């Protein structure tokens, strides 16, 4: 069994959208070859299915729910952690038409790891209370990444680990970060860093929610 977060939101009906990246063996830079380990079992199985094949799923599980309040919301995502971000934010804006102030920070190593960007730029255009920011931790030369100097400057996004970008470009200048509700999902190291960031900024436990998909 493997746990996958849903990218779909309730208004999309019975269609279930998952973001699955096939887990290839790690690359051994010293040997200049792939490590001799098996690829991901569940992701390999999913990628081997054809349209019309039947599979068995169960759920949903977990407690990654939206708090019912008027507080500002901060979303932080990385990698395949994009899935529940889309689900939450589409429900908040497309269904609830929320007036809450919301920012979403999404990080990847290079541009090729980013996806759904057009979805969130469209939300940003449609809802003035929503802002979307992107950061790359290790941009490639071919990314031609145009670095933003601050929140309001032109550019593609920031450079650095996403939690550091949130601190440097948002939280350090925020009047009351302790009043923000935090929602996050990403690789284990990112989750740990964002969890600590919340503690450092005095966020109450009940206002910190994350989706752990077993990474």
Predicted features and spans:
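Histidine-anchored nucleotide/phosphate-binding helix
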Residues: 6, 84-96
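Structural motif
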Residues: 53-55
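Phosphate- and divalent-cation-binding pockets in alpha/beta enzyme and binding domains
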Residues: 65, 84, 193-197
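A phosphate-binding catalytic loop at a beta-strand-loop-alpha-helix junction
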Residues: 72-88
């Amino acid at each position: 069994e493997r746990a996958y977060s849903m990218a779909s939101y309730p208004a999309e009906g019975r269609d279930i959208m998952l973001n699955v990246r096939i887990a290839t063996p790690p690359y051994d830079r010293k040997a200049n070859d792939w490590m001799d380990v098996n690829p991901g079992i569940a992701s390999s199985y999913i990628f081997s299915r054809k349209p019309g094949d039947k599979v068995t799923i169960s759920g949903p599980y977990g407690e990654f729910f939206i708090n019912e309040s008027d507080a500002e919301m901060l979303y932080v995502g990385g990698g395949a952690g994009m899935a529940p971000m889309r689900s939450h934010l589409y429900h908040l804006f497309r269904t609830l038409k929320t007036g809450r102030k919301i920012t979403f920070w999404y990080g990847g190593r290079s541009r090729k790891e980013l996806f759904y960007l057009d979805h969130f730029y469209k939300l940003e255009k449609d809802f003035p209370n929503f802002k979307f920011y992107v950061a790359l931790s290790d941009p490639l030369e071919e990314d031609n990444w145009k670095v933003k100097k601050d929140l309001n400057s032109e550019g593609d996004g920031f450079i650095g680990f996403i939690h550091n970008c949130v601190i440097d470009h948002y939280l350090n200048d925020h009047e009351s970060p302790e009043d923000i509700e935090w929602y996050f999902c990403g690789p284990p190291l990112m989750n740990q860093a964002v969890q600590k960031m919340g503690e450092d900024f005095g966020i109450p436990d009940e206002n910190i929610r994350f989706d752990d998909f077993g990474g």
